[in-house]
C-alpha cells in the first residue's frame, strides 16, 4: 500500500497534532501553516490573522492501517466544525476548520465525508469546515513540533490539549498506539 498525507486544521495545531499522534498507523505529524497567501510565514505572522493561513497539521499515515476517512473521523471528533474561526478559547481565521486535500480523490472523499456527517446531523449546528486544495504547506518552527509531548504540564496543554488526547484514547481505544 504505502503512505499518504492528510492536511487538516481544526484550531490550535498543538491540539490536532497531539490527537493525531495517538492513532495507530500514523507515522508522522508536522505542525505548520497553509491556506493563505503569505510565503513562509512565522508563528507571529499567522497569529496576527493577516496571512490568510490556518494552523494545520500534516498527518502521514500507513494506508495498510488507516484510510483517509479514519483520519477525518478523528479530526472531526477532536474539534468543533460548526464554529467559524474559533476552536475553544482560540479565536481568529487562523483557527478555522479546514481540510486541505492533496489531490482530487482526497477532495471527493473529504466532501463525501462532510456530506455524510451533515446528513446524519452529527453536530448541533451546520458544518462550516472549508475544503480547499492544498497549495503550499509551511512547517512551523521546531519549538511547535511535538509541543504536547514536550510540554504536557503547560497550562494550555492541561486545559486544552490533554482532553482531546483523552477523547481519542476513549473513543478510538483499539485504534490507538
Curated annotation (Swiss-Prot):
UniProt GO molecular function: L-methionine:thioredoxin-disulfide S-oxidoreductase activity; peptide-methionine (S)-S-oxide reductase activity
Organism: Halobacterium salinarum (strain ATCC 700922 / JCM 11081 / NRC-1)
Gene3D superfamilies, alphabetized: Peptide methionine sulphoxide reductase MsrA
Enzyme Commission designation: 1.8.4.11
Key word Secreted present: no
Annotated catalytic residues: 12
Family: Belongs to the MsrA Met sulfoxide reductase family.
Summary of the function given for this chain in its UniProt record: Has an important function as a repair enzyme for proteins that have been inactivated by oxidation. Catalyzes the reversible oxidation-reduction of methionine sulfoxide in proteins to methionine.
Alphabetized InterPro entries for the sequence: Met_Sox_Rdtase_MsrA_dom, Met_Sox_Rdtase_MsrA_sf
Chemical reaction(s) catalysed: L-methionyl-[protein] + [thioredoxin]-disulfide + H2O = L-methionyl-(S)-S-oxide-[protein] + [thioredoxin]-dithiol; [thioredoxin]-disulfide + L-methionine + H2O = L-methionine (S)-S-oxide + [thioredoxin]-dithiol
Gene: msrA
Highest rank taxon of the organism: Archaea
Keyword Oxidoreductase listed: yes
Protein name per UniProt: Peptide methionine sulfoxide reductase MsrA
Keywords assigned: Oxidoreductase
One example of a Gene Ontology biological process annotation: protein modification process
Amino acid at each position: 500500500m504505502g503512505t499518504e498525507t492528510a492536511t487538516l486544521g481544526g484550531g490550535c495545531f498543538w491540539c490536532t497534532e497531539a490527537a493525531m499522534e495517538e492513532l495507530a498507523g500514523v507515522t508522522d505529524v508536522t505542525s505548520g501553516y497553509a491556506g493563505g497567501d503569505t510565503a513562509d510565514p512565522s508563528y507571529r505572522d499567522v497569529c496576527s490573522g493577516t496571512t490568510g493561513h490556518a494552523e494545520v497539521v500534516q498527518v502521514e499515515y500507513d494506508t495498510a492501517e488507516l484510510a483517509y476517512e479514519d483520519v477525518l473521523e478523528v479530526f472531526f471528533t477532536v474539534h468543533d466544525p460548526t464554529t467559524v474561526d474559533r476552536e475553544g478559547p482560540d479565536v481568529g481565521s487562523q483557527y478555522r476548520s479546514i481540510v486541505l486535500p492533496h489531490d482530487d480523490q482526497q477532495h471527493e472523499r473529504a466532501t463525501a465525508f462532510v456530506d455524510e456527517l451533515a446528513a446524519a446531523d452529527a453536530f448541533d449546528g451546520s458544518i462550516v469546515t472549508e475544503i480547499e486544495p492544498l497549495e503550499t504547506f509551511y512547517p512551523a518552527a521546531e519549538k511547535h513540533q511535538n509541543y504536547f509531548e514536550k510540554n504536557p504540564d503547560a497550562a494550555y496543554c492541561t486545559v486544552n490539549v490533554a482532553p482531546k488526547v483523552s477523547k481519542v484514547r476513549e473513543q478510538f481505544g483499539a485504534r490507538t498506539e
